[in-house]
Amino acid sequence: MEQLIAAILTMVAGVLVCAAYFWSTNLVLDWIFPSKGKFGAVASRNLRIANSIRPWLFLAPALLALTLYLVYPVVQSVWLSLHGRGGQNFVGLSNYSWMINDGEFRQSIFNNFLWLLVVPALSTFFGLIIAALTDRIWWGNIAKTLIFMPMAISFVGAAVIWKFIYDYRAAGSEQIGLLNAIVVALGGEPQAWITLPFWNNFFLMVILIWIQTGFAMVILSAALRGIPEETIEAAVIDGANGWQIFFKIMVPQIWGTIAVVWTTITILVLKVFDIVLAMTNGQWQSQVLANLMFDWMFRGGGDFGRGAAIAVVIMILVVPIMIWNIRNATRESGGH
């Protein structure tokens, strides 16, 4: 109860502070550049200057927060990446040289690119197919709700659920893991799925695909509904079958939205951390960049320089895709 009251008071205080800020800054601006009581060129000049400054007064808190929580951490991370374990001794590019020669880093890069090849493609594909199918059945909204539900679960929560599905017990013991129970029922031998090198990456990917398919489905369903009916009717009149209508008429018209969904999931994949941490903690050759960074910075490594260098690599991989995604989304919204 105390936490709820504290949260409410914090929200009220925040609103009051914002209101006081906007009121006082506008008051000061009108005092410095008054237009009331002024005439002619002076009034026009003051009004023009005040109107040009006023938007920046509204943007100032957001710009301050952006600088404090985004720009400063980026600069600090780059600076730390050029220093040693304690962040004190300048070592230049030694941390980046270490990364190139480190086997675990190379394994993490390989795993991340493996995730990039599989997760965005399958999440977008399943989302598109499900969106197209559920729009044609009367219980489609119920199906969409069920498929979207994993989006409401945290990555750690989803990992715990799937950890039970992949659970392994020795042969002869009762299998509580759903997957091994099915394998044993079919006459097979139980497997420790998440400890199988290379293949365990795919078992972890299933979790993120399970979550992100709902996201892709919702966005692509809205895009499909925005396709003009006239184009589909014209294709039917011309004798096109269902496959031709879908792949040659519908998909090309929503290609921009598909690209936005794909790249959004790609950005998420490059930063994947929670699932790997909760399922394997990077063991059995399942390490990824974000978890490796966490290990070096906050665990046994305790090396802020190397951890920051890995963070910079993640940023370099994410930023170009993020910029392209924003531009493409802006172009799509402008087109509609």
From Swiss-Prot:
It is a multi-pass membrane protein. It is found in: Cell inner membrane. The keyword Transport applies. The chain crosses the membrane at residues 4-24, 55-75, 113-133, 146-166, 176-196, 202-222, 258-278, 304-324. GO terms for cellular component: plasma membrane. GO terms for biological process: transmembrane transport. Pfam families: BPD_transp_1. The keyword Lipid biosynthesis does not apply. SUPFAM superfamilies: MalF N-terminal region-like, MetI-like. It comes from the Bacteria. InterPro entries: ABC_transporter_permease, MetI-like, MetI-like_sf. Keywords: Cell inner membrane, Cell membrane, Membrane, Sugar transport, Transmembrane, Transmembrane helix, Transport. Residues 109-325 form the ABC transmembrane type-1 domain. Belongs to the binding-protein-dependent transport system permease family. MalFG subfamily. Part of the binding-protein-dependent transport system for alpha-glucosides such as sucrose, maltose and trehalose. Probably responsible for the translocation of the substrate across the membrane. This is Alpha-glucoside transport system permease protein AglF. It comes from Rhizobium meliloti (strain 1021). The gene is aglF.
